[in-house]
Amino acid sequence: MEVLYSLSKTLKDARDKIVEGTLYSNVSDLIQQFNQMIVTMNGNDFQTGGIGNLPVRNWTFDFGLLGTTLLNLDANYVENARTTIEYFIDFIDNVCMDEIARESQRNGVAPQSEALRKLSGIKFKRINFDNSSEYIENWNLQNRRQRTGFVFHKPNIFPYSASFTLNRSQPMHDNLMGTMWLNAGSEIQVAGFDYSCAINAPANIQQFEHIVQLRRALTTATITLLPDAERFSFPRVINSADGATTWFFNPVILRPNNVEVEFLLNGQIINTYQARFGTIIARNFDTIRLSFQLMRPPNMTPAVNALFPQAQPFQHHATVGLTLRIESAVCESVLADANETLLANVTAVRQEYAIPVGPVFPPGMNWTELITNYSPSREDNLQRVFTVASIRSMLIK
Protein backbone atom coordinates (compact mmCIF):
# COMPACT_ATOMS: atom_id res chain seq x y z
CA MET A 1 0.00 0.00 0.00
CA GLU A 2 2.89 2.36 0.77
CA VAL A 3 4.34 1.75 -2.70
CA LEU A 4 0.98 2.52 -4.32
CA TYR A 5 0.79 5.79 -2.38
CA SER A 6 4.38 6.74 -3.24
CA LEU A 7 3.78 6.02 -6.93
CA SER A 8 0.64 8.14 -6.94
CA LYS A 9 2.25 11.02 -5.05
CA THR A 10 5.25 11.01 -7.40
CA LEU A 11 3.03 10.93 -10.47
CA LYS A 12 0.81 13.71 -9.16
CA ASP A 13 3.82 15.93 -8.49
CA ALA A 14 5.33 15.08 -11.88
CA ARG A 15 2.11 15.86 -13.71
CA ASP A 16 1.77 19.18 -11.90
CA LYS A 17 5.40 20.34 -11.97
CA ILE A 18 7.08 18.90 -15.06
CA VAL A 19 5.76 21.54 -17.44
CA GLU A 20 7.28 23.47 -20.31
CA GLY A 21 9.40 26.44 -19.22
CA THR A 22 10.15 25.18 -15.71
CA LEU A 23 13.76 25.49 -14.58
CA TYR A 24 15.32 22.04 -14.33
CA SER A 25 16.94 22.98 -11.04
CA ASN A 26 13.48 23.54 -9.54
CA VAL A 27 12.36 19.96 -10.28
CA SER A 28 15.67 18.07 -10.25
CA ASP A 29 14.88 16.23 -7.00
CA LEU A 30 11.47 15.22 -8.34
CA ILE A 31 13.00 13.98 -11.60
CA GLN A 32 15.54 11.88 -9.68
CA GLN A 33 12.68 10.40 -7.68
CA PHE A 34 10.75 9.83 -10.91
CA ASN A 35 13.73 8.05 -12.46
CA GLN A 36 14.09 5.86 -9.37
CA MET A 37 10.46 4.85 -9.87
CA ILE A 38 11.12 3.96 -13.53
CA VAL A 39 14.25 1.93 -12.70
CA THR A 40 12.35 -0.07 -10.08
CA MET A 41 9.30 -0.71 -12.28
CA ASN A 42 11.15 -1.52 -15.51
CA GLY A 43 11.22 -5.19 -16.44
CA ASN A 44 8.07 -6.02 -14.46
CA ASP A 45 4.73 -7.21 -15.81
CA PHE A 46 1.35 -6.85 -14.10
CA GLN A 47 -2.23 -7.86 -14.78
CA THR A 48 -5.35 -6.06 -13.53
CA GLY A 49 -9.08 -6.63 -13.86
CA GLY A 50 -10.99 -9.81 -14.57
CA ILE A 51 -13.72 -9.24 -11.99
CA GLY A 52 -17.22 -8.11 -12.92
CA ASN A 53 -17.00 -6.02 -16.09
CA LEU A 54 -13.55 -4.67 -15.21
CA PRO A 55 -11.50 -5.73 -18.25
CA VAL A 56 -8.30 -7.73 -18.00
CA ARG A 57 -5.32 -5.54 -18.84
CA ASN A 58 -1.66 -6.46 -19.04
CA TRP A 59 1.01 -3.92 -18.17
CA THR A 60 4.67 -3.97 -19.20
CA PHE A 61 7.23 -1.44 -17.99
CA ASP A 62 10.17 -0.54 -20.22
CA PHE A 63 10.70 3.22 -20.12
CA GLY A 64 13.72 5.43 -20.60
CA LEU A 65 14.92 7.76 -17.87
CA LEU A 66 14.41 11.50 -17.90
CA GLY A 67 17.66 13.32 -18.64
CA THR A 68 19.28 16.39 -17.13
CA THR A 69 19.48 19.85 -18.61
CA LEU A 70 21.03 23.14 -17.56
CA LEU A 71 18.14 25.20 -18.86
CA ASN A 72 14.37 25.22 -18.78
CA LEU A 73 12.37 22.12 -19.70
CA ASP A 74 11.45 22.32 -23.38
CA ALA A 75 8.44 20.89 -25.24
CA ASN A 76 10.21 17.68 -26.29
CA TYR A 77 11.39 16.97 -22.74
CA VAL A 78 7.90 17.50 -21.34
CA GLU A 79 6.28 15.41 -24.10
CA ASN A 80 8.56 12.46 -23.39
CA ALA A 81 7.82 12.74 -19.68
CA ARG A 82 4.08 13.00 -20.33
CA THR A 83 4.00 9.70 -22.22
CA THR A 84 5.51 7.91 -19.25
CA ILE A 85 3.38 9.77 -16.70
CA GLU A 86 0.11 8.98 -18.51
CA TYR A 87 0.94 5.26 -18.76
CA PHE A 88 1.82 5.07 -15.07
CA ILE A 89 -1.34 6.96 -14.07
CA ASP A 90 -3.49 4.62 -16.15
CA PHE A 91 -1.78 1.69 -14.44
CA ILE A 92 -2.33 3.10 -10.94
CA ASP A 93 -5.98 3.82 -11.76
CA ASN A 94 -6.56 0.22 -12.82
CA VAL A 95 -4.70 -1.21 -9.82
CA CYS A 96 -6.89 0.89 -7.53
CA MET A 97 -10.13 -0.12 -9.27
CA ASP A 98 -9.08 -3.79 -9.18
CA GLU A 99 -8.41 -3.51 -5.45
CA ILE A 100 -11.66 -1.65 -4.74
CA ALA A 101 -13.59 -4.41 -6.51
CA ARG A 102 -12.31 -7.18 -4.24
CA GLU A 103 -13.13 -8.27 -0.70
CA SER A 104 -12.22 -11.07 1.66
CA GLN A 105 -13.69 -12.43 4.87
CA ARG A 106 -10.21 -13.12 6.25
CA ASN A 107 -7.48 -10.49 6.62
CA GLY A 108 -9.42 -8.05 4.47
CA VAL A 109 -7.02 -5.23 5.37
CA ALA A 110 -4.27 -6.87 3.27
CA PRO A 111 -4.00 -6.35 -0.52
CA GLN A 112 -6.47 -8.56 -2.41
CA SER A 113 -5.61 -7.95 -6.07
CA GLU A 114 -2.76 -9.72 -7.83
CA ALA A 115 -1.20 -6.42 -8.92
CA LEU A 116 -1.14 -4.81 -5.47
CA ARG A 117 0.17 -8.00 -3.89
CA LYS A 118 3.04 -7.93 -6.36
CA LEU A 119 3.71 -4.24 -5.63
CA SER A 120 3.92 -5.16 -1.94
CA GLY A 121 6.97 -7.32 -2.66
CA ILE A 122 10.41 -6.54 -1.32
CA LYS A 123 11.82 -5.49 -4.71
CA PHE A 124 9.52 -2.45 -4.79
CA LYS A 125 10.44 -1.13 -1.35
CA ARG A 126 12.75 1.42 -2.96
CA ILE A 127 9.60 3.24 -4.08
CA ASN A 128 8.83 4.64 -0.66
CA PHE A 129 9.15 8.40 -0.80
CA ASP A 130 6.27 9.87 1.21
CA ASN A 131 3.78 8.11 3.46
CA SER A 132 2.35 11.07 5.32
CA SER A 133 -1.27 10.26 4.40
CA GLU A 134 -3.57 9.76 7.38
CA TYR A 135 -5.12 6.76 5.65
CA ILE A 136 -1.71 5.16 4.96
CA GLU A 137 -0.61 5.69 8.57
CA ASN A 138 -3.79 4.15 9.93
CA TRP A 139 -3.74 1.32 7.40
CA ASN A 140 -0.24 0.42 8.61
CA LEU A 141 -1.43 0.43 12.22
CA GLN A 142 -4.53 -1.64 11.43
CA ASN A 143 -2.42 -4.10 9.43
CA ARG A 144 -0.31 -4.62 12.58
CA ARG A 145 -3.45 -4.71 14.75
CA GLN A 146 -2.52 -1.56 16.59
CA ARG A 147 -4.74 1.35 17.61
CA THR A 148 -5.76 3.63 14.75
CA GLY A 149 -7.22 7.13 14.93
CA PHE A 150 -9.16 8.68 12.07
CA VAL A 151 -10.26 12.30 12.29
CA PHE A 152 -13.73 12.74 10.80
CA HIS A 153 -15.84 15.81 10.14
CA LYS A 154 -19.52 14.97 10.09
CA PRO A 155 -18.96 11.20 10.36
CA ASN A 156 -21.72 8.90 9.15
CA ILE A 157 -21.85 7.08 12.47
CA PHE A 158 -25.65 6.86 12.87
CA PRO A 159 -27.48 4.32 10.69
CA TYR A 160 -30.65 5.77 9.21
CA SER A 161 -33.52 5.37 11.65
CA ALA A 162 -36.84 7.21 11.52
CA SER A 163 -39.72 6.12 13.71
CA PHE A 164 -41.88 6.94 16.73
CA THR A 165 -42.91 5.51 20.08
CA LEU A 166 -46.31 6.21 21.59
CA ASN A 167 -46.58 6.32 25.38
CA ARG A 168 -50.29 7.11 25.14
CA SER A 169 -52.52 5.95 22.32
CA GLN A 170 -56.15 5.26 21.40
CA PRO A 171 -57.84 3.62 18.39
CA MET A 172 -58.91 7.06 17.16
CA HIS A 173 -55.36 8.44 17.46
CA ASP A 174 -56.77 11.76 18.67
CA ASN A 175 -54.94 12.14 22.00
CA LEU A 176 -51.43 10.83 21.55
CA MET A 177 -48.23 11.31 23.51
CA GLY A 178 -44.78 10.02 22.66
CA THR A 179 -41.52 10.63 20.82
CA MET A 180 -40.46 10.60 17.19
CA TRP A 181 -36.94 10.72 15.84
CA LEU A 182 -34.71 10.79 12.82
CA ASN A 183 -31.13 9.54 13.17
CA ALA A 184 -28.90 9.70 10.10
CA GLY A 185 -25.28 10.44 9.25
CA SER A 186 -23.90 12.62 12.01
CA GLU A 187 -27.20 14.03 13.29
CA ILE A 188 -29.96 13.10 15.71
CA GLN A 189 -33.28 14.93 15.77
CA VAL A 190 -35.81 13.88 18.37
CA ALA A 191 -39.16 15.38 19.35
CA GLY A 192 -41.47 14.75 22.28
CA PHE A 193 -45.15 15.57 21.79
CA ASP A 194 -48.35 15.56 23.78
CA TYR A 195 -51.66 16.38 22.12
CA SER A 196 -53.09 17.53 25.47
CA CYS A 197 -50.00 19.60 26.35
CA ALA A 198 -49.39 17.70 29.61
CA ILE A 199 -52.78 18.66 31.06
CA ASN A 200 -53.03 15.44 33.10
CA ALA A 201 -49.32 14.81 33.64
CA PRO A 202 -47.76 15.15 37.12
CA ALA A 203 -47.07 18.85 37.69
CA ASN A 204 -48.11 19.34 34.04
CA ILE A 205 -44.74 17.97 32.89
CA GLN A 206 -44.07 15.16 30.41
CA GLN A 207 -40.66 13.49 30.46
CA PHE A 208 -39.01 12.17 27.27
CA GLU A 209 -35.86 10.17 26.62
CA HIS A 210 -33.97 9.07 23.50
CA ILE A 211 -31.01 6.68 23.61
CA VAL A 212 -28.71 6.04 20.65
CA GLN A 213 -26.01 3.37 20.68
CA LEU A 214 -23.08 3.86 18.30
CA ARG A 215 -21.55 1.01 16.32
CA ARG A 216 -18.08 2.30 17.15
CA ALA A 217 -16.82 4.49 19.99
CA LEU A 218 -15.87 8.10 19.27
CA THR A 219 -13.38 10.28 21.12
CA THR A 220 -12.67 14.03 21.39
CA ALA A 221 -15.92 14.91 19.67
CA THR A 222 -17.06 18.46 18.99
CA ILE A 223 -20.85 18.50 19.07
CA THR A 224 -23.61 21.03 18.46
CA LEU A 225 -26.72 20.74 20.64
CA LEU A 226 -29.81 22.81 19.80
CA PRO A 227 -33.16 23.12 21.64
CA ASP A 228 -35.19 22.43 18.50
CA ALA A 229 -35.93 19.66 16.00
CA GLU A 230 -36.82 21.44 12.79
CA ARG A 231 -37.70 18.25 10.90
CA PHE A 232 -40.64 17.78 13.28
CA SER A 233 -41.88 21.36 13.21
CA PHE A 234 -44.51 21.09 10.47
CA PRO A 235 -47.79 19.15 10.04
CA ARG A 236 -47.68 15.64 8.65
CA VAL A 237 -49.70 12.47 8.25
CA ILE A 238 -48.05 9.43 9.85
CA ASN A 239 -48.70 5.75 9.31
CA SER A 240 -49.79 3.93 12.46
CA ALA A 241 -47.49 1.29 13.91
CA ASP A 242 -49.63 -1.58 12.58
CA GLY A 243 -50.11 0.09 9.20
CA ALA A 244 -53.90 -0.09 9.57
CA THR A 245 -54.51 3.66 9.53
CA THR A 246 -52.85 7.07 9.57
CA TRP A 247 -52.83 9.84 12.15
CA PHE A 248 -52.41 13.60 11.98
CA PHE A 249 -49.55 15.43 13.66
CA ASN A 250 -49.89 19.21 13.86
CA PRO A 251 -47.04 20.50 16.05
CA VAL A 252 -46.86 23.75 17.96
CA ILE A 253 -43.29 24.18 19.14
CA LEU A 254 -42.39 24.88 22.78
CA ARG A 255 -38.92 25.16 24.24
CA PRO A 256 -37.78 21.96 25.99
CA ASN A 257 -37.16 22.06 29.74
CA ASN A 258 -34.54 20.35 31.91
CA VAL A 259 -32.51 19.18 28.93
CA GLU A 260 -29.76 16.73 29.77
CA VAL A 261 -27.38 14.89 27.45
CA GLU A 262 -25.18 12.08 28.72
CA PHE A 263 -22.28 10.47 26.87
CA LEU A 264 -21.56 6.94 28.06
CA LEU A 265 -18.82 4.40 27.39
CA ASN A 266 -19.50 0.75 28.25
CA GLY A 267 -22.41 1.87 30.41
CA GLN A 268 -20.39 4.42 32.42
CA ILE A 269 -21.21 8.13 32.19
CA ILE A 270 -18.21 10.05 30.80
CA ASN A 271 -19.71 13.51 30.20
CA THR A 272 -22.99 15.13 31.23
CA TYR A 273 -24.41 18.47 30.12
CA GLN A 274 -27.51 20.09 31.57
CA ALA A 275 -29.36 22.98 29.91
CA ARG A 276 -26.31 23.80 27.82
CA PHE A 277 -26.71 24.45 24.12
CA GLY A 278 -24.40 25.34 21.27
CA THR A 279 -20.97 23.69 21.19
CA ILE A 280 -20.23 20.92 23.67
CA ILE A 281 -17.38 18.41 23.91
CA ALA A 282 -17.61 14.67 24.50
CA ARG A 283 -14.43 12.93 25.57
CA ASN A 284 -15.11 9.27 24.84
CA PHE A 285 -18.45 7.54 24.23
CA ASP A 286 -20.37 4.77 22.52
CA THR A 287 -23.86 5.76 23.69
CA ILE A 288 -25.79 9.03 23.77
CA ARG A 289 -28.74 9.55 26.12
CA LEU A 290 -30.96 12.60 25.59
CA SER A 291 -33.60 13.50 28.16
CA PHE A 292 -35.90 16.52 28.14
CA GLN A 293 -39.30 17.71 29.31
CA LEU A 294 -42.43 19.27 27.90
CA MET A 295 -43.92 21.66 30.47
CA ARG A 296 -47.39 23.07 30.04
CA PRO A 297 -46.97 26.87 30.18
CA PRO A 298 -48.23 28.06 33.59
CA ASN A 299 -49.22 31.42 32.14
CA MET A 300 -50.68 31.84 28.68
CA THR A 301 -52.13 34.68 26.67
CA PRO A 302 -55.64 34.04 25.30
CA ALA A 303 -54.13 33.17 21.91
CA VAL A 304 -51.82 30.54 23.40
CA ASN A 305 -54.55 29.24 25.70
CA ALA A 306 -56.73 28.66 22.65
CA LEU A 307 -54.05 26.41 21.19
CA PHE A 308 -54.02 24.13 24.23
CA PRO A 309 -57.59 23.60 25.52
CA GLN A 310 -58.43 21.69 28.69
CA ALA A 311 -60.28 18.93 26.83
CA GLN A 312 -60.61 17.37 23.39
CA PRO A 313 -60.57 17.96 20.52
CA PHE A 314 -56.87 18.81 20.43
CA GLN A 315 -56.23 20.43 17.08
CA HIS A 316 -52.72 21.62 17.90
CA HIS A 317 -50.10 19.35 19.41
CA ALA A 318 -47.52 20.63 21.89
CA THR A 319 -44.04 19.57 20.79
CA VAL A 320 -40.50 20.00 22.09
CA GLY A 321 -37.36 18.79 20.41
CA LEU A 322 -33.58 18.54 20.30
CA THR A 323 -30.97 18.36 17.57
CA LEU A 324 -27.57 16.82 18.26
CA ARG A 325 -24.99 17.05 15.50
CA ILE A 326 -21.45 15.64 15.60
CA GLU A 327 -19.24 18.22 13.89
CA SER A 328 -15.95 16.33 14.24
CA ALA A 329 -14.60 13.35 16.14
CA VAL A 330 -11.85 10.75 16.23
CA CYS A 331 -12.71 7.10 15.63
CA GLU A 332 -10.54 3.99 15.74
CA SER A 333 -12.54 2.59 12.83
CA VAL A 334 -12.84 3.96 9.32
CA LEU A 335 -16.20 5.61 8.56
CA ALA A 336 -17.88 7.34 5.70
CA ASP A 337 -17.75 11.11 6.12
CA ALA A 338 -20.00 13.77 4.60
CA ASN A 339 -16.88 15.84 3.87
CA GLU A 340 -15.15 13.06 1.91
CA THR A 341 -15.94 11.29 -1.36
CA LEU A 342 -14.36 7.93 -0.52
CA LEU A 343 -17.62 5.99 -0.09
CA ALA A 344 -18.97 7.54 -3.28
CA ASN A 345 -15.77 6.67 -5.18
CA VAL A 346 -15.79 3.06 -4.00
CA THR A 347 -19.49 2.63 -4.72
CA ALA A 348 -19.18 4.24 -8.16
CA VAL A 349 -16.38 1.87 -9.23
CA ARG A 350 -18.25 -1.19 -8.00
CA GLN A 351 -21.46 -0.11 -9.72
CA GLU A 352 -19.84 1.00 -13.00
CA TYR A 353 -18.13 -2.36 -13.48
CA ALA A 354 -21.01 -4.48 -12.13
CA ILE A 355 -18.88 -6.03 -9.39
CA PRO A 356 -20.80 -9.04 -8.04
CA VAL A 357 -21.94 -9.04 -4.42
CA GLY A 358 -19.24 -10.69 -2.35
CA PRO A 359 -19.07 -12.19 1.13
CA VAL A 360 -18.43 -8.92 3.00
CA PHE A 361 -20.10 -5.79 1.62
CA PRO A 362 -23.88 -5.40 1.22
CA PRO A 363 -25.43 -4.89 -2.23
CA GLY A 364 -24.84 -1.38 -3.53
CA MET A 365 -22.53 -0.63 -0.57
CA ASN A 366 -25.68 0.31 1.39
CA TRP A 367 -24.15 2.36 4.20
CA THR A 368 -27.04 1.96 6.66
CA GLU A 369 -26.85 -1.82 6.35
CA LEU A 370 -23.04 -1.77 6.45
CA ILE A 371 -22.72 0.35 9.58
CA THR A 372 -25.64 -1.39 11.32
CA ASN A 373 -23.78 -4.69 11.07
CA TYR A 374 -20.24 -3.33 11.23
CA SER A 375 -18.27 -6.55 11.68
CA PRO A 376 -14.46 -6.72 12.03
CA SER A 377 -14.34 -8.20 8.52
CA ARG A 378 -16.23 -5.25 7.09
CA GLU A 379 -14.01 -2.85 9.02
CA ASP A 380 -10.83 -4.41 7.61
CA ASN A 381 -12.08 -4.41 4.03
CA LEU A 382 -13.51 -0.92 4.30
CA GLN A 383 -10.24 0.46 5.62
CA ARG A 384 -8.37 -1.12 2.71
CA VAL A 385 -10.72 0.10 -0.04
CA PHE A 386 -10.99 3.59 1.51
CA THR A 387 -7.19 3.78 1.66
CA VAL A 388 -6.99 2.79 -2.00
CA ALA A 389 -9.75 5.27 -2.89
CA SER A 390 -7.85 8.06 -1.13
CA ILE A 391 -4.75 7.17 -3.16
CA ARG A 392 -6.72 7.05 -6.41
CA SER A 393 -8.30 10.43 -5.69
CA MET A 394 -4.87 12.08 -5.93
CA LEU A 395 -4.80 11.25 -9.64
CA ILE A 396 -8.40 10.64 -10.71
CA LYS A 397 -11.09 13.17 -9.87
UniProtKB/Swiss-Prot annotation:
Reported modifications of this chain: The N-terminus is blocked.
Protein keywords: Calcium, Capsid protein, Intermediate capsid protein, Metal-binding, Ubl conjugation, Virion, Zinc
Short name of one Pfam family: Rota_Capsid_VP6
GO molecular function: host cell surface receptor binding; metal ion binding; structural molecule activity
Transmembrane segments: none
Gene3D superfamilies in UniProt: 2.60.120.170, Viral capsid alpha domain (1.10.1350.10)
Additional remarks: The VP6 trimer contains a zinc ion located at the center of the molecule. The zinc ion is not essential for either trimerization or transcription activity of the DLP. Zinc-depleted VP6 has an increased sensitivity to proteases.
Purpose of the protein: Intermediate capsid protein that self assembles to form an icosahedral capsid with a T=13 symmetry, which consists of 230 trimers of VP6, with channels at each of its five-fold vertices. This capsid constitutes the middle concentric layer of the viral mature particle. The innermost VP2 capsid and the intermediate VP6 capsid remain intact following cell entry to protect the dsRNA from degradation and to prevent unfavorable antiviral responses in the host cell during all the replication cycle of the virus.
Protein name stated in the entry: Intermediate capsid protein VP6
Species of provenance: Rotavirus A (strain RVA/Human/Japan/YO/1977/G3P1A[8])
Organism taxonomic ancestry: Viruses, Riboviria, Orthornavirae, Duplornaviricota, Resentoviricetes
